[in-house]
């Protein structure tokens, strides 16, 4: 009998919303509860494409905006065989940023439509759950200054947030808003409950394709 597939769970949100912390805590909690769970993070900086992106994000190199958008998408596509293999083996994948960040951060630049931004990622594995960690940008800034990488400034984050809200109107995706202004443990508990439900539901349906 084939293993029940794992769930694909994505955490999204503005910088400083707590995605990385909550992603780690979720994997730990799921494993402690007897699930097989692993963490993925995008961009995946260890690949050749990922190294290019890391250099770009650290402002060590410049890449034309359309080109870098396609590189971010390629960085996701090169992980698709691994994603599909893990899910088919019954491993739940918790993903810190996915295509939605890619679309929102390019869409926040001038003269990019969300429709154009989405096209390279059409057909990626479709998440069973997309958790959006909702936090006012003023509250995010109180958690420490935004970092020094490209895109890490308040004005840009504001434009990206508007793009995220446009993406969340898509009813074909299982978006769940999480109040990230609460304590780390309270946010974790909200995420854990939603994720356990997604894992149960995922076993009953095949893996979908994003934006198709």
Swiss-Prot record:
GO terms of molecular function: ATP binding; dTMP kinase activity; nucleoside diphosphate kinase activity
Cofactor(s) in the UniProt record: Mg(2+)
Gene3D superfamilies per UniProt: P-loop containing nucleotide triphosphate hydrolases
GO biological process: cellular response to growth factor stimulus; dTDP biosynthetic process; dTTP biosynthetic process; dUDP biosynthetic process; thymidine biosynthetic process
Modification type N6-acetyllysine: residues: 169
GO cellular component, one term: cytosol
Protein name, UniProt field: Thymidylate kinase
Gene from which the chain derives: DTYMK
């Amino acid at each position: 009998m084939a293993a029940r597939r794992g769930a694909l769970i994505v955490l999204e949100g503005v910088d400083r919303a707590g995605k990385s912390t909550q992603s780690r805590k979720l994997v730990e909690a799921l494993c402690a509860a007897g699930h097989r769970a692993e963490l993925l993070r995008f961009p995946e900086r260890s690949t050749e494409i990922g190294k290019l992106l890391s250099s770009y994000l650290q402002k060590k190199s410049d890449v034309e905006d359309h080109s870098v958008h396609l590189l971010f998408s390629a960085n996701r596509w090169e992980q698709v065989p691994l994603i599909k293999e893990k899910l088919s083996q019954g491993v739940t994948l918790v993903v810190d940023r996915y295509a939605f960040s890619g679309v929102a951060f390019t869409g926040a630049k001038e003269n990019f439509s969300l429709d154009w931004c989405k096209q390279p990622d059409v057909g990626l594995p479709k998440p069973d759950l997309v958790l959006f960690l909702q936090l006012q940008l003023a509250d995010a800034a109180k958690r420490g200054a935004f970092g020094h990488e490209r895109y890490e400034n308040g004005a840009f984050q504001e434009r990206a947030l508007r793009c995220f809200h446009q993406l969340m109107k898509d009813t074909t995706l299982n978006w769940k808003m999480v109040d990230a202004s609460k304590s780390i443990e309270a946010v974790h508990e909200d995420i854990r409950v939603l994720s356990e439900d997604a894992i149960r539901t995922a076993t009953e349906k095949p893996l979908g394709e994003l934006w198709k």
